[in-house]
Design a protein with these regions (language model features):
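Generic detector of well-ordered alpha-helical segments enriched in charged/polar residues
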Residues: 31, 171-178, 224-232
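Accessory, usually C-terminal, subdomains that scaffold auxiliary metal cofactors
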Residues: 183-187, 191-192, 196-257
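OB-fold ssDNA-binding interfaces and closely related basic DNA-contact patches used
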Residues: 1-157, 202-209, 214-218, 256-257
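Extended serine/threonine-enriched, polar tracts that run as long, contiguous segments within proteins
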Residues: 145-209
């Protein structure tokens, strides 16, 4: 009989050293020796075959913020914003964005198991309406969840991100943002806004929303032109927005509608 060979010992110090060396070899910044805009090798990937990342405000039940979850992002905690594609954590600090697209509200119907039953519930459908319990006379939230969707440009790099609001964030974030957008007699992409994570609490639990404030109208012509270019790119583009069940983000009490 042959015995099993002993498993080779792993030198953790070597793995750590390799990781340290790798961190010195890569960067999110494009070095001077690489030509910006050169898409060599990626020509076959059409715009419709790629999705832009989403700007997400982590909640207690967000998988990326839960230690032990396979998709956990190191350092991410509830109340922090992050990029769901690159896993970059933006943190708790206020974010400066330019809005280049604001869609009409849409509705999604979810099942009891949080699966999507109908991703495109028509406006005016009975599932989008509040009802009243005949016995308790209490208002019952619609069966379908309302979403407000945007495309924003984040920070000095003007990084395009998809952004969706649902639940209480509609009343606390989306509608204030829409009001600010309508206030100025300028194109939607001509203003900059500040999104600040805000802690919320009620009988259903705790969660975070973005507090929205307008910084002002863009003064730099180059920034304005870049924002206009992104507006033209995304105004008709099919963007993959959030279709997550509201329980993964915040307590859903119907107060957002």
């Amino acid at each position: 009989m042959f015995g099993l060979a002993a498993a080779p010992e792993v030198d953790d110090s070597l793995a750590a050293a390799a990781a340290a060396d790798l961190s010195l070899e890569v960067s999110n910044e494009i070095p001077d020796f690489i030509q910006k805009g050169d898409r060599e090798g990626a020509d076959q990937i059409a715009a419709e075959d790629a999705r832009i990342p989403r700007l997400v405000l982590a909640q207690a039940q967000t998988p990326q913020a839960m230690r032990g979850d396979p998709v956990y992002i190191d350092g991410l905690a509830a109340g922090m914003a992050f990029n769901d594609l690159t896993n970059v954590v933006y943190g708790e600090a206020p974010l400066e964005v330019i809005v280049v697209r604001a869609d009409k509200p849409r509705w999604v119907e979810f099942g009891d198991d949080r699966s999507v039953i109908d991703p495109s519930v028509p406006p005016g459908d009975l599932r989008t309406q509040f009802t009243t319990d005949p016995e308790t006379k209490k208002r019952i939230p619609p069966k379908a969840t309302m979403f407000y969707d945007y495309v924003v440009l984040l920070g000095p790099q003007m990084e395009p991100l998809a952004l969706s609001f649902k639940g209480s964030a509609i009343k606390l974030s989306a509608r204030p943002l829409n009001g600010l957008i309508k206030m100025k007699p300028v194109p939607i992409y001509a203003c900059k806004y500040r999104f600040t994570p805000r802690f919320m609490k009620n009988d259903e639990g705790t969660w975070y929303v973005f507090n929205v404030a307008q910084i002002g109208v863009l003064k730099n012509q180059e920034t304005f032109q870049k924002a206009k270019e992104q507006f033209n790119i995304f105004k008709l583009k099919d963007v993959s927005f959030d279709v997550e069940h509201p329980d993964t983000d915040a307590p859903e009490d119907g107060s957002g509608i």
